[in-house]
């Protein structure tokens, strides 16, 4: 098999290497000593052979995809030769690797990186895939999301990296600043001061470059982290709110319901009830 990254992406998106079952790795419970665990989300795709993965609780065969959320883990048990294609979604770049287990040792067949630039298409697709963990039986939808994510990866590989304009570069720097400090008491004024610009220019920058308001982006970032805490930790709603930068837990609950049509407690219960449902067989 030819192991060029762009070639593999095209074959997975358009065939003949069609996507089969989408599995979701564990993000709860004790992590085995030899398990793979990183702080960024990733996809593990089987190209050839098969193996048992403890994190997925299943035997993966060619075309199967294992989605490992940020902080999640997987633990492949190699019993026969197999080849996998991994995509790591780092904050600043994507990492691609093709690894083969020949029965005795690992061999790296391909490795490539590309910068994550421009609109946050990949980030929103990953958020959608995180939500799919609540409904793993919806396999057709999960396959379409993964295919879209792989298509986005191929677009990044195929595009010419252009130097960002000054306003675009500033917007991305501010966005990263918010992503790292969302739990702090951020305001439009404090963020503007950190970058030596006026609050009005900050608002203009978000509307023009990001097509989203500053407060809207800040709240969205905090709510996404709140969802992660609600799903993975047994914290009180008030503790989740404060951990994500919301001073007023009542405001957090109103905002959460407005964005999800569920209260934080309902969201947590639905997530855990979905996890207990047995996934259906591949369509």
UniProtKB/Swiss-Prot annotation:
<dbReference type="GO" id="GO:0003700">
    <property type="term" value="F:DNA-binding transcription factor activity"/>
</dbReference>
<feature type="DNA-binding region" description="H-T-H motif">
    <location>
        <begin position="189"/>
        <end position="210"/>
    </location>
</feature>
<keyword id="KW-0804">Transcription</keyword>
<protein>
    <recommendedName>
        <fullName>Uncharacterized HTH-type transcriptional regulator YijO</fullName>
    </recommendedName>
</protein>
<feature type="DNA-binding region" description="H-T-H motif">
    <location>
        <begin position="237"/>
        <end position="260"/>
    </location>
</feature>
<dbReference type="Pfam" id="PF12833">
    <property type="entry name" value="HTH_18"/>
</dbReference>
<dbReference type="GO" id="GO:0043565">
    <property type="term" value="F:sequence-specific DNA binding"/>
</dbReference>
<dbReference type="InterPro" id="IPR009057">
    <property type="entry name" value="Homeodomain-like_sf"/>
</dbReference>
<dbReference type="InterPro" id="IPR020449">
    <property type="entry name" value="Tscrpt_reg_AraC-type_HTH"/>
</dbReference>
<feature type="domain" description="HTH araC/xylS-type">
    <location>
        <begin position="172"/>
        <end position="270"/>
    </location>
</feature>
<keyword id="KW-0238">DNA-binding</keyword>
<dbReference type="InterPro" id="IPR018060">
    <property type="entry name" value="HTH_AraC"/>
</dbReference>
<keyword id="KW-0805">Transcription regulation</keyword>
<dbReference type="InterPro" id="IPR018062">
    <property type="entry name" value="HTH_AraC-typ_CS"/>
</dbReference>
């Amino acid at each position: 098999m030819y192991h060029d990254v762009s070639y593999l992406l095209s074959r997975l998106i358009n065939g003949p290497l069609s996507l089969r079952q989408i599995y979701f790795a564990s993000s709860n419970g004790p992590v085995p000593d030899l398990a793979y665990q990183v702080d960024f989300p990733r996809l593990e795709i089987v190209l050839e052979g098969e193996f048992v993965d403890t994190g997925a609780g299943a035997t993966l065969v060619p075309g199967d995809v294992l989605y490992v959320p940020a902080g999640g883990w997987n633990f492949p048990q190699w019993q026969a030769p197999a080849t996998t294609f991994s995509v790591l979604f780092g904050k600043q770049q994507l990492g691609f690797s093709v690894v083969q287990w020949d029965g005795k040792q690992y061999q790296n067949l391909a490795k490539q990186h590309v910068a994550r630039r421009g609109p946050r298409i990949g980030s929103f697709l990953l958020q959608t895939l995180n939500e799919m963990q609540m409904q793993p039986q919806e396999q057709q939808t999960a396959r379409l999301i993964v295919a879209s994510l792989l298509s986005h990866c191929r677009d990044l590989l195929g595009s010419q990296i252009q130097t960002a304009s000054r306003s675009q570069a500033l917007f991305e720097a501010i966005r990263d600043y918010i992503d790292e400090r969302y739990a702090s008491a951020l305001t439009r004024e404090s963020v503007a001061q950190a970058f030596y610009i006026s609050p009005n220019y900050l608002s203009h920058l978000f509307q023009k470059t990001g097509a989203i308001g500053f407060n809207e982006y800040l709240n969205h970032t905090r709510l996404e982290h709140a969802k992660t805490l609600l799903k993975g930790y047994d914290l009180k709603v008030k503790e989740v709110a404060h951990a994500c930068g919301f001073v007023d837990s009542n405001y957090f609950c109103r905002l959460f319901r407005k964005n999800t049509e569920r209260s934080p407690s309902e969201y947590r219960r639905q997530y855990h009830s979905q996890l207990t449902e047995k996934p259906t067989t591949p369509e």
